[in-house]
Amino acid sequence: MQFEKEVEILASREKVWNFIWDVDRFIACVPGCKEAKTIEAGKLYSATMVEKVGPFRVEFPTTIEVLERDELTRIRAQASGADNKIGSRMKLSLDVNLRQDGEKTVLGFIAGIDILGKLAALGHGIIKRKAEQVLDEFAHAVKQRLEGES
């Protein structure tokens, strides 16, 4: 499944870029992210994602690897994790783009998500709705956080 989202933020591209790399502030905007750790700054991170999807409560210990980083412009990353309790795996590819538009920064996401195992048995529709909800909540939280800072 692939998802695309753009959000306009009344902040400079530099401010948005710095926010993305401030792991503690950034993860506070990620719905269901219970904890995150920097393993190698700018390259490798770990996080635990907890969500309710249909009848399942999933907990994915996740590894996030930054594959490309173009300063102030683009980040390409991949993540993967598994919930062994319910026998499900998740893979994510993520492309994040920033572009200045006057006083605003347009923050764009393209995410590809693959779900395997019991969670996949819920069907495309349920998983798609949940993924869209999480992405919308995340975009809203980032916008509120950055626009609320002076």
Q: How would you describe each model-predicted region?
A:
Residues 68, 116-150:
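A conserved amphipathic terminal alpha-helix motif
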Residues 5-7, 33, 61-68, 92-100:
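Hydrophobic/aromatic beta-strand elements that line small-molecule binding cavities or substrate pockets
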